[in-house]
């Protein structure tokens, strides 16, 4: 790395720290990209830190293709665990484990931008190994699917049977469709709407 490249890296650091400080001050968290353990650890740490700093509301912006369900579970549970009220703002797409995180907030605090798309579906997993291990993993995926369907039914007000039928395959919803379905309370177009 030459001196010019090193200077560019050094110049980026204060902006990064300043941006993070501003996000902390504004009590905003961004969940962008795949859901994994690293993201879950970061988001849960941010939630605990913000809760320790104040009881003021927190905003989480979600734009995710989904990912690891258990990582999504940890964020979902932490949102419910902390004292401050959490608002979810969907943007881009809110899919799979991203939707699991999104519904951690009560319906009245679930918002989205107009072009947000939502995807609900059953969990998937790759299995290999001995037949008995594959059987165990299949049972666990079925239990996970039943649990996730129950969470979605409670969050949306839809009957469990409808959720199970809809999530049997990929179930896409526009912002307006998600509002009608009970995923979203309001579609917002500016920060002033929040």
From Swiss-Prot:
Its EC number is 3.4.21.92. Disulfide bonds: none annotated. Signal peptide: none annotated. This is ATP-dependent Clp protease proteolytic subunit 3. The active site is at 96 (nucleophile), 121. SUPFAM superfamilies: ClpP/crotonase (SSF52096). One of its GO terms (cellular component) is endopeptidase Clp complex. The keyword Translocase does not apply. Its main location: cytoplasm. NCBIfam families: PRK12553.1 (NF009205). Fourteen ClpP subunits assemble into 2 heptameric rings which stack back to back to give a disk-like structure with a central cavity, resembling the structure of eukaryotic proteasomes. It comes from the Bacteria. GO terms for molecular function: ATP-dependent peptidase activity; ATPase binding; serine-type endopeptidase activity. Gene3D superfamilies: 2-enoyl-CoA Hydratase, Chain A, domain 1. One of its GO terms (biological process) is protein quality control for misfolded or incompletely synthesized proteins. It is found in: Cytoplasm. It is an enzyme of class 3 (hydrolase). Belongs to the peptidase S14 family. InterPro entries: ClpP, ClpP/crotonase-like_dom_sf, ClpP/TepA, ClpP_His_AS. Cleaves peptides in various proteins in a process that requires ATP hydrolysis. Has a chymotrypsin-like activity. Plays a major role in the degradation of misfolded proteins. PANTHER family: ATP-DEPENDENT CLP PROTEASE PROTEOLYTIC SUBUNIT. It catalyses: Hydrolysis of proteins to small peptides in the presence of ATP and magnesium. alpha-casein is the usual test substrate. In the absence of ATP, only oligopeptides shorter than five residues are hydrolyzed (such as succinyl-Leu-Tyr-|-NHMec, and Leu-Tyr-Leu-|-Tyr-Trp, in which cleavage of the -Tyr-|-Leu- and -Tyr-|-Trp bonds also occurs). PROSITE patterns: CLP_PROTEASE_HIS. Keywords: Cytoplasm, Hydrolase, Protease, Serine protease. It comes from Rhizobium etli (strain ATCC 51251 / DSM 11541 / JCM 21823 / NBRC 15573 / CFN 42). CDD domains: S14_ClpP_2.
